A protein has these predicted regions:
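Conserved, mostly hydrophobic/aromatic
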Residues: 60, 153, 224, 263, ...
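Glycine-centered loop-to-beta-strand initiation motif
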Residues: 454-469, 552-561
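Glycan-recognition patch characteristic of GH18 chitinases/ENGases
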Residues: 27-139
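Glycan-binding loop/region signatures in secreted carbohydrate-active enzymes
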Residues: 110-120, 267-364, 393-396
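Substrate-binding surface in catalytic domains of secreted glycosidases
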Residues: 70-84, 159-307
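Short, acidic/polar
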Residues: 40-54, 129-144, 205-215, 353-366
Length: 595
């Protein structure tokens, strides 16, 4: 790589130095392909599931919030978990190294009088620039106040409540909203994710839920999670047929970078009543609210085999849909409305995805180079299903990167003086010490908002090194990083805290007459008003004289008025105290002869 010489001035707040180094592992761990949702109503099962599969997961989406109006996002978690404050699970997830990207649903449509959803409430809010700006501000406040890594929007009412005739209008409003929210989030170094039902290539004649405008928002969003489930709801059938999901993915990657696309997988199944004989009790048992043809119940995948065994059913795998199914009969005994004993028998049909289903869907990640899969929801899966995902993740595991910084140790120990030319070098290799050449590389600094920002971009040399000459402008936490590829992970060095001292210039006289009042002036750089300047004095008798203190003006200038009453040697040193931007800074000692 041809080296480019550039001097950079960087200003940032100091953060603590991470002293541990990144080391290579003997074997590549699984590719982190799994994401998913942690609902507020199932924390006891969903959180342990997410925490126990950290080798597969890089991010999670707490399903805890709903947008109620333009100024209000309601916390659904706290009322549902009064004895388990939100700080607890957030701390666990952060300790696991997960990015936390909570989901916000559309809660604007609830009619308090009828209890039924009212169409177009959110769409109309997005039509108004002032309301749209308020929603953006409300979301930003939620993200920043909780130090989330981004936000996920799950606004399904556009698809399932609003009339089809409204979709073209909603699409325009949605795109404008996404543009404004994206700009605001990205300005803070945060991510924007959207979760939507499937869309399809318009050329096929089946556009799907096109109001979510995948092509138009592709450059604005960081992630798309496709809800490749709920294909069958009102009548028995597969939850999310593989070919149906594949068509949505094929279209998605044609309009959105595949590295942004996640395919949703269901951790649940459905159990439909297909026929009923006899007179059913008025109070059916177990999870059914009603026993009638067409009514379905939702169950967790991990209960599927138990359900089948309880009724002597044998699940069969349907290769066309890549899902399992079985049928059974269930008899309900109880009391009729008139008080007499009664019973009915319901024929039921079950569909769900199992470990084989998850394997086939996880394989789509390699086929299309997708970001991953997203489970609705963590905690519903059979353990074998995650074993299946792990097997796929291991088979497509990317190479690890060994990254290190080779720099002058004084940068992070005693520090350097402002204006001192330095250079910083990162070295990037594979675990077998093969240099990673030609990789896009970046020098980054840590901002006050906790986000890393590129300040210099380039590429690694043939020997895997990346060198940048730097003129540091203040204390800063820095690192070097190379971009990941499909076959290799992103690689970043241990953060380095660079310590910088101010420059203090002043010119006291070499000698002065005893008892004569005189003024000495100087300047602190960088120029800034209000910097505390201390003058330390030691007389020829080695006795300390009370120090003097002043502050700088807008140009960094300062002055002291002195009067050495008795002859002798007076040694002076000017200093500025340590603060967030600079370490303790001292001028050289200067001796003034007093005659």
């Amino acid at each position: 790589m041809k080296k480019r010489h550039i001097y950079l001035t960087v200003f940032a707040t100091v953060f603590s130095l991470i002293v541990s180094s990144f080391t290579a592992k003997a074997a590549n761990p699984p590719r982190k392909i799994l994401s998913g949702w942690i609902p507020y109503y199932s924390m006891k099962t969903s959180l342990p599931s997410a925490m126990s599969n950290a080798d597969l997961i890089s991010q999670v989406s707490p399903f805890w919030y709903t947008l109620k109006n333009k100024n209000t996002i309601t916390d659904l978690y706290t009322p549902a978990n009064p004895s388990f404050p939100m700080a607890g699970p957030l701390s666990q997830l952060q300790s696991a190294g997960y990015k936390i990207i909570p989901t916000i649903t559309d809660g604007t449509n609830v009619n308090l009088t009828t209890g039924k959803p009212t169409p177009l409430i959110l769409s109309n809010l997005l039509a108004d620039p002032a309301s749209r700006a308020s929603i953006v501000s409300t979301i930003i406040n939620l993200v920043m106040s909780n130090k989330f890594d981004g936000i996920d929007l799950d606004f399904e009412d556009f698809a399932y409540v609003d009339p089809i005739s409204s979709w073209p209008t909603t699409q325009v409003r949605w795109v404008q909203f996404i543009q404004e929210l994206s700009t605001a989030l990205h300005a803070q170094g945060k991510l924007l994710s959207i979760t939507t039902p499937p869309s399809f290539d318009p050329a096929t004649g089946k556009k799907g839920y096109y109001q979510y405008a995948w092509p138009q928002v592709a450059s604005m969003i960081d992630q798309l999670h496709i809800m490749a489930y709920d294909f069958s709801t009102t009548s028995p059938g597969p939850i999310g047929p593989l070919d149906w999901a594949t068509r949505a993915i094929t279209y998605a990657v044609s309009v959105i970078p595949a590295s942004k696309v996640y395919v949703g997988i269901p951790g649940y199944g459905r159990d439909w009543v297909t026929s009923v004989s006899g007179v059913c009790p008025t109070l059916p048992v177990n999870y059914e609210k009603t026993v009638a043809k067409g009514v379905s119940a939702v169950f967790a995948m991990h209960d599927a085999t138990t359900l089948a065994a309880a009724y002597g059913a044998t699940p069969t795998f349907n290769p066309q849909y890549a899902e399992s199914t079985f049928t059974y009969q269930k008899t309900y005994n109880g009391t009729a409305a008139n008080g007499s004993l009664t019973s009915c028998t319901a024929s039921r049909t079950v569909w769900y995805q199992d470990q084989q289903s998850f394997t086939l869907r996880a394989n789509l990640i390699n086929t299309y180079r997708l970001a991953g899969i997203s489970e609705w929801t963590f905690g519903m899966e059979d353990p074998l299903a995650f074993t299946a995902i792990r097997n796929v993740a291991v088979s497509i595991a990317p190479d690890q990167v060994v990254a290190s910084l080779n720099n002058d140790a004084t940068l992070s120990t005693t520090g350097i003086t402002l204006g001192t030319p330095t250079s910083i070098t990162g070295t990037f290799t594979l675990p077998d010490k093969t240099p990673i050449a030609g990789a896009p590389a970046h020098l980054q600094v840590l901002g006050v908002n906790g986000a890393w920002t590129n300040i210099f971009d380039g590429a690694t040399a043939a020997d895997g090194t990346f060198t940048v000459p730097v003129l540091w402008g203040s204390n800063v936490t820095a690192r070097m990083i190379i971009d990941g590829t499909w076959t290799r992970l992103e690689g970043d060095t241990t953060p380095l805290v660079v310590k910088v001292a101010r420059v203090i210039a002043w010119s006291p006289p070499a000698s002065i007459k005893a008892g004569l009042t005189y003024t000495v002036a100087g300047q602190v750089q960088p120029k800034a008003a209000g910097v505390t300047v201390n003058l330390g004095i030691v007389s020829s008798t080695k006795s300390s004289i009370a120090p003097m203190t002043t502050t700088t003006d807008a140009n960094g200038n300062f002055s002291f008025t002195l009067n050495n009453a008795t002859p002798g040697f007076y040694t002076y040193q000017v200093s500025t105290p340590e603060d967030a931007s600079y370490i303790l800074s001292n001028s050289p000692f200067v001796t003034v002869v007093t005659r």
